[in-house]
């Protein structure tokens, strides 16, 4: 059994929906910490959950008011993705391979997250884009053809002898003239600009004013297609 298969089976047995093996050797050391590869772990949000959030007037604020965030599916799957990354980094290290988890706790503790700019040198969505899984939408989140933005991601950087997937070129933006996320944003932080490699995050979104209302995620037409395919309407 190859190491790729071993790791994928191990992660999927613990709840991962997909695993991608990505070459990051062409990126700067400042981004990669000198590691050659990244392992991307993905979890998908359920269609029923997304439909419930989409139909709610202000789901996130209500969950906070009722002190129910700890049982929210998105919150739980974000935690699970982080836990899987921490587990994988330990698993690889025990096998003698250098590995670094990019879980939220890890990047905070190691100073790889800049609190002032609310950024990290190598976001999960950047790795996902390099894997050919999707593009960066006008809401500054990954959009995938299959799930829209209804995903939770975490990554592990490593020098383990894995085989990385060959991607001809990252997907270009499929947002076109769509402005749904900008129109529905209650904080008016989405600027409506299509992302490309020369675009700064701040040119797309005012992250400092975003309250994470989640509306741009559930109302993205690509997320809606995923919901409709799986909810029978």
Q: Language-model features: where?
A:
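Non-catalytic, usually N-terminal nucleic-acid engagement modules in DNA/RNA processing proteins
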Residues: 1-74
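Catalytic cores of enzyme domains
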Residues: 29, 70-187, 191-233
């Amino acid at each position: 059994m190859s190491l790729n298969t071993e790791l994928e089976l191990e992660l999927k047995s613990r709840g991962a929906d997909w695993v991608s093996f990505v070459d990051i050797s062409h990126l700067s050391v400042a981004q990669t910490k000198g590691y050659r590869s990244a392992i991307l772990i993905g979890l998908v949000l359920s269609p029923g959950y997304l439909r419930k959030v989409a139909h709610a007037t202000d789901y996130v604020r209500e969950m906070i008011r009722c002190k129910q965030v700890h049982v929210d599916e998105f919150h739980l799957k974000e935690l699970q993705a982080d836990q899987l990354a921490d587990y994988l980094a330990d698993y690889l290290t025990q096998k003698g391979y250098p590995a670094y988890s990019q879980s939220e706790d890890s990047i905070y503790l190691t100073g790889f997250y800049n609190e002032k700019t609310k950024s990290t040198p190598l976001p999960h969505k950047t790795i996902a884009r390099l894997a050919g899984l999707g593009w960066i939408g006008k809401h500054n989140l990954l959009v995938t053809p299959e799930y829209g933005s209804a995903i939770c991601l975490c990554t592990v950087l490593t020098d383990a002898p894995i085989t990385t997937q060959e991607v001809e070129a990252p997907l270009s933006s499929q947002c076109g003239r769509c402005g749904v996320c900008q129109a529905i944003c209650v904080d008016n932080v989405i600027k409506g600009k299509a992302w490309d490699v020369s675009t700064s995050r701040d040119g797309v979104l005012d992250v400092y004013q975003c309250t994470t209302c989640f509306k741009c995620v559930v109302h993205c037409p690509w997320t809606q297609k995923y919901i409709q395919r799986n909810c029978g309407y």
